[in-house]
């Protein structure tokens, strides 16, 4: 029987349990696991809505729908992004990783989401612990960097193709104009 899962955190939990991953990824200890689950449950309401939705609405929705959004319409996501980064900074100011002193799938999820902020040229200078953690996560997880490099290549190709087919009338997601005002 084929198992089909469509939610990223469900997939991460399943893989951590079914593949014999080291315990730190998704701890057997219920208290530690609850910390990981807590972050994963918060992730979609803060970081995903901040980074993911902002990137989609600002950069890719205009290519798909032909409709642009005003800065005022994007402000909601900028506020969520600022709050999410403050939450990450608070956690990472106390511990090396989001849920303690060992890396977990919560860190992997957050790092992947934040790495996509390259599309909006987000600077993390206001959040030094978060910035250091993200660079550490990227350095320690070469596969993540490799996969994201492939995704950036596909995205740049997508943008270039859209510009070519639509007379260049599009905000380049790799330009400074795509950066949110935090």
Model-derived regions, located:
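GST superfamily/GST-like fold recognition
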Residues: 46, 50-55, 98-128, 134-137
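Surface-exposed helix-capping loop/turn segments at secondary-structure junctions
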Residues: 21-22, 90-101, 142-148
